[in-house]
Swiss-Prot record:
Protein name per UniProt: Protein E4
Superkingdom of this protein's organism: Viruses
Modification comment: Phosphorylated by host ERK. The phosphorylation triggers a structural change that enhances keratin binding and protein stability.
UniProt-annotated location(s): Host cytoplasm; Host nucleus
Record family assignment: Belongs to the papillomaviridae E4 protein family.
Biased segments, Pro residues type: 22-37, 89-106
Disordered: annotated span: 1-204
Gene Ontology cellular-component annotations: host cell cytoplasm; host cell nucleus
Organism: Human papillomavirus 5
Keywords: Early protein, Host cytoplasm, Host G2/M cell cycle arrest by virus, Host nucleus, Host-virus interaction, Modulation of host cell cycle by virus, Phosphoprotein
Extra information: The major E4 form is first synthesized as an E1^E4 fusion protein from spliced E1^E4 transcripts, such that the first few amino acids of the E4 protein are derived from the N terminus of E1.
Quaternary structure and partners: Assembles into oligomeric complexes. Interacts with host CDK1. Interacts with host SRPK1; this interaction may favor expression of late viral transcripts. Interacts with host cytokeratin components KRT8 and KRT18.
């Protein structure tokens, strides 16, 4: 039979061996590839409109841009047309924009009304006084003739009133003739004013000649009436 106490020293010796043993060294981690810079959306132009220097990649060549990657997959970029290959160069760089337009030169407040008067878009000006459409300023020197002045009393061109025959009719006719003479003397129109121009002078001269003619006819009529009255009184004075 084996002694149980003999196993105890063996187990104890194994535990001591495990504690004294060092763990094996760990293998070194695998080398990681170096990080490549992230390509910008506009690799040829930065925020200050300056060309960006090209950076070398891990293998010494220029970094692959996003546009080249798209072209390698078969997509057409903005710089490639239907007849251009993926290896063609990009489009030329855009020129920097100029300064934004300002509010413009200031205008003096004194020149405002003058420029408004000279604006040709206001439309045609209304014609001046005395101008007629189609004849501007033609009637300014020739105003229309004034209407003839009204004549007081008997002007001489009134229709003759026939008096009834007989002694009563002759007396009434005589009274009317006497009244007509007085009215003619009171209502005699003044002489016409001197003509100012050719047109108005011709009109006034014709009116004056007509008035003179009518006045002569009226005087003849009054004279004939007076002669008739004298004969009538003579007949009344003689006994029949």
């Amino acid at each position: 039979m084996t002694d149980p106490n003999s196993k105890a020293p063996r187990l104890q010796g194994r535990q001591e061996d495990k504690q004294t043993q060092t763990p094996p060294p760990r293998p070194p981690p695998p080398p990681q590839p170096p990080l490549t810079p992230r390509p910008d959306s506009s690799p040829h132009q930065n925020s200050h409109n300056k060309p960006k220097p090209e950076e070398e990649g891990t293998d010494g060549g220029p970094p692959a841009s996003q546009g080249d990657r798209k072209r390698s997959k078969g997509d057409q970029g903005p710089d490639t047309g239907p007849g251009l290959g993926p290896g063609r160069g990009p489009s030329p760089k855009p020129t920097p924009l100029g300064p934004p337009p300002g509010p413009g030169p200031r205008r003096s407040p004194r020149l405002g009304p003058l420029q408004a008067d000279r604006d040709p878009e206001e439309g045609p000006q209304p014609p001046a006084e005395g101008e007629v459409e189609g004849h501007p300023g033609g009637d300014q020197g020739h105003p229309p003739p004034p209407p003839p002045a009204p004549h007081n009393g008997h002007s001489g061109h009134e229709p003759k009133v026939q008096q009834p025959e007989g002694p009563e009719g002759r007396e009434g006719h005589e009274e009317g003739a006497v009244g007509g003479e007085g009215g003619d003397e009171e209502g005699h129109p003044p002489p016409p004013p001197p003509p100012t121009n050719g047109h108005e002078g011709g009109l006034l001269s014709s009116v004056a000649s007509l008035l003179v003619k009518w006045e002569g006819h009226f005087d003849q009529l009054v004279q004939s009436i007076q002669d008739d009255l004298e004969d009538y009184w003579k007949k009344l004075a003689t006994p029949q």
